[in-house]
Amino acid sequence: MFTKWKEKFAAKKATDHAVDESRKWKKNALFQDCLHAMRGSCTVAPMDLHEAAIAAVNIAIREGTWAELSGVSEDLFSGMVYLVWGEATLPVLRAPWAVAVENLKRIRIVDPNAFIVAETMDKILWFSVHDRISLYNIT
């Protein structure tokens, strides 16, 4: 009986923490700018995908392997992508590839250090301060 109560308490605590984090993001002006840049066509990624996207970006940065994006087919990035912001405390957002591409300039204005991670988690687009788009290949 004590174990069930303990599990129930732990689940409630985790839920309360998620709600608190959500409230904190809603008050964050930069996060509101991020949402505005995506014109509301995105959702906050689940925690497991959030962690996978952050890990993919960290690997790409550490390995430093990249190639220019020229000639890359849009088909390569069809589906959903994850926006990883330069501000580590902001949640990863999930959005359709077409919406992310359509709003590139707005994303750069909000956070020039933002990354976009493809659904497959093996390709990362990086939007740099100098308006250059690079393709990271971490496979």
What would you call each of these model-derived segments?
Residues 1-132, 136-139:
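Structured alpha/beta or helical-core interaction and ligand-binding surfaces enriched in interleaved
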